[in-house]
């Protein structure tokens, strides 16, 4: 049973379904870039079997919190492992680095096999169940990626104007441009 970050909720919930309890640490409607875990959240991590976080710099607090835990049995997975990160992302404070919004392109979302594998490792008795659900999730992501590509391919103008420059991975996949205005 493990607390996880919002972006990482879909696959564990789909993979684990009735086999595990999946808890979201970051409350709905809260800005994840600024969120900090409470003492209760850290206590919950001490009792968790698995901790899944997005990575790529999204959760600035992860290293310090993980370093403070005494739970030596906690399986930790960074969901963005294996994804080529976009560099040159400028955050709200003007700092430039890797773009943490990797999940906003369906092709990246289906690369969450590392999440499925940690669930299999933490609960070997249900490993086949987790793998089958991951495979279904990957197919759904592939279908969504195809739908995006087909729907937008005929558009003459593929520029996307947003209030938060979070869609770079999706724009790369669709060969469009994103700009914060």
Q: What kind of region is each of these model predictions?
A:
Residues 1-181:
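Extracytoplasmic metal-acquisition and chelation regions
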